[in-house]
């Protein structure tokens, strides 16, 4: 696992955008995440696109997850969110931006179809991830199998509470979602996880330095042959081997 510590959230966004842009310019398949953390990275990519530095015209994208019961046109669906935050502002082909079918009549069949669609596309080249305060990635809550596939899950009460800021009130937040499983996520060729802020420090420490455990779904990154974790100083505050990570970053072979 490669741990990159940057001074500020803005620096994290730039570093993540560097990696994503390098893939986009080779017409790669990108795994995209929603939520508040990736927004700055998407803004950086939009700015680079406007300057002619990156193109997504040859890329396709798969989202990590989607709320159960929300149609793509619902303003809080993750498909609508990723269009609002990113893909509609660059030259992505809308037809090549896919999300799990949250409004499907048969959600279980929809999850299996989503896994198959990723396989049919040749897999994901780079998967952008965030991490929740309880260690979840995607909607893989604590106790999720480390080999799980795309499936329907019940959301942890803390996740419902955290996501209520995007809705008018707590009651409107869906209690279930369709999410790529930890096994599905781990099949991406490169995992890129970003985290900022003191509220993520415990989760980052557990993911990087804690035991491999379903209690911290993010710890599955420990098993991946190419995982990059980019955090700001606040999110890195509890890392015991922080000085080594800084040294390794400064002495990387390019």
Curated annotation (Swiss-Prot):
Question: Gene3D superfamilies from the xrefs?
Answer: 3.40.50.1360
- Molecular-function GO terms, alphabetical: glucosamine-6-phosphate deaminase activity; identical protein binding
Q: Which reactions fall under this protein's catalytic activity?
A: alpha-D-glucosamine 6-phosphate + H2O = beta-D-fructose 6-phosphate + NH4(+)
Matching Pfam families: Glucosamine_iso
Q: Which UniProt keywords apply?
A: Carbohydrate metabolism, Hydrolase
Domain of life, per lineage: Bacteria
Catalytic residue list: 65, 134, 136, 141
What EC designation does it have?
3.5.99.6
Q: What does this protein do?
A: Catalyzes the reversible isomerization-deamination of glucosamine 6-phosphate (GlcN6P) to form fructose 6-phosphate (Fru6P) and ammonium ion.
Q: Which family does it belong to?
A: Belongs to the glucosamine/galactosamine-6-phosphate isomerase family. NagB subfamily.
Cited PANTHER family: GLUCOSAMINE-6-PHOSPHATE ISOMERASE
HAMAP family hit by this protein: GlcN6P_deamin
Q: What is this protein called?
A: Glucosamine-6-phosphate deaminase
Annotated organism of origin: Corynebacterium aurimucosum (strain ATCC 700975 / DSM 44827 / CIP 107346 / CN-1)
Q: What is the lineage of its organism?
A: Bacteria, Bacillati, Actinomycetota, Actinomycetes, Mycobacteriales
């Amino acid at each position: 696992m490669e741990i990159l510590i940057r001074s500020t959230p803005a620096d994290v966004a730039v570093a993540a955008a560097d990696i994503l842009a390098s893939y986009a310019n080779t017409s790669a398949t990108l795994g995209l995440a929603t939520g508040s953390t990736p927004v700055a990275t998407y803004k950086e990519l939009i700015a680079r696109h406007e300057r002619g530095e990156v193109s997504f015209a040859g890329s396709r994208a798969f989202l990590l997850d989607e709320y159960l019961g929300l149609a793509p046109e619902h303003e809080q669906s993750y498909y609508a969110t990723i269009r609002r935050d990113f893909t509609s502002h660059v030259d992505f082909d809308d037809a090549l931006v896919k999300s799990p079918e949250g409004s499907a009549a048969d959600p279980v069949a929809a999850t299996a179809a989503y896994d198959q669609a990723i396989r049919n596309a040749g897999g994901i080249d780079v998967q952008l991830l965030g991490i929740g305060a309880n260690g979840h990635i995607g909607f893989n809550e604590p106790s999720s199998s480390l080999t799980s596939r795309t499936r329907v899950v019940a959301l942890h009460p803390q996740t419902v509470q955290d996501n209520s800021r995007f809705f008018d009130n707590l009651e409107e937040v869906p209690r279930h979602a369709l999410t790529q499983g930890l096994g599905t996520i781990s099949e991406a060729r490169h995992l890129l996880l970003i985290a900022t802020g003191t509220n993520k420090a415990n989760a980052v420490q557990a993911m990087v330095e804690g035991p491999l455990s379903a209690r911290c779904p993010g710890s599955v990154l420990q098993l991946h042959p190419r995982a990059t974790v980019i955090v700001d100083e606040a999110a890195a505050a509890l890392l015991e081997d922080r000085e080594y990570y800084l040294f390794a970053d400064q002495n990387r072979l390019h």
